[in-house]
């Protein structure tokens, strides 16, 4: 496909490497657990869930990674400080190395999670999700005081969804912020910024989302990713059309997985692929594209890192 002239940063969190030239490293896959209305959760406020079912889901992802060579990260979503602490406790009990995103719709919950990870000594595996234009000072203060050094930096510009708008929000500010998000991240003590290009709906900036991947990597040299599956879930036509079909999921899933593959070809280093239940569908598809990217990288003179475990070697 292509090779960037600019040096591409490679960051490591919990043994997982993010960044580099397209095809140099296997694409990182980020699952989501304990999301809103996740069927394994019985009480979202107290963090009560089916531990056996959760572990089965997690072990499936581990097995798929072993088969393909694609590394993985877990996105832990909590709606209260109590629930997210319980989810983190469960995760670090069953897995002692894998990095995880701490995520919530509430800033005070994200802040509490960053503080908790510091207290229990796992901040080196935690990735704050996210530093964005709506972040409040209270969250900034706690994140700064924490030991968390990795964060998703969101390139969401509410007033300008273009590629320029995404770069502006990262570098100079906008949407009510007088500082760029990268500066805010640096002031919070973030040493590992992972750019989320903020996937926009089809017809409302989806093209700019994909184009921003190589643009941001080319200009800033930072690892780039996103929750591209949101393009499919926000597609009004598809939502309506699938309901008219005998097997709505069969209609929906190719589009869901496909959004990730398009972004991957454009240079995305990591994919927040959504519910962990989709793990068996996404891993083989992403590994397939990684083989193509790996072959191209070799032709362009890029040395494949850990070639033995890369899909281009392992699966061919």
From Swiss-Prot:
Keywords of the record, alphabetical order, are:
Methanogenesis, Methyltransferase, One-carbon metabolism, Transferase, Translocase
Q: Could you provide one GO biological process annotation from this protein's UniProt record? A: one-carbon metabolic process
Enzyme Commission number: 7.2.1.4
Q: Which InterPro entries match?
A: Dihydropteroate_synth-like_sf, MeTrfase_MtrH/MtxH, MtrH
Pathway annotation from the record: One-carbon metabolism; methanogenesis from CO(2); methyl-coenzyme M from 5,10-methylene-5,6,7,8-tetrahydromethanopterin: step 2/2
Catalytically driven reaction(s): 5-methyl-5,6,7,8-tetrahydromethanopterin + coenzyme M + 2 Na(+)(in) = 5,6,7,8-tetrahydromethanopterin + methyl-coenzyme M + 2 Na(+)(out)
List the GO molecular function terms. tetrahydromethanopterin S-methyltransferase activity
Enzyme class name: translocase
Keyword Translocase attributed: yes
Q: What does this protein do?
A: Part of a complex that catalyzes the formation of methyl-coenzyme M and tetrahydromethanopterin from coenzyme M and methyl-tetrahydromethanopterin. This is an energy-conserving, sodium-ion translocating step. MtrH catalyzes the transfer of the methyl group from methyl-tetrahydromethanopterin to the corrinoid prosthetic group of MtrA.
Could you tell me which HAMAP family the record lists for this protein?
MtrH (MF_01501)
Protein family membership: Belongs to the MtrH family.
Indicate the quaternary assembly: The complex is composed of 8 subunits; MtrA, MtrB, MtrC, MtrD, MtrE, MtrF, MtrG and MtrH.
The protein in question is named Tetrahydromethanopterin S-methyltransferase subunit H
Question: Species name for this entry?
Answer: Methanosarcina acetivorans (strain ATCC 35395 / DSM 2834 / JCM 12185 / C2A)
Q: Which gene encodes it?
A: mtrH
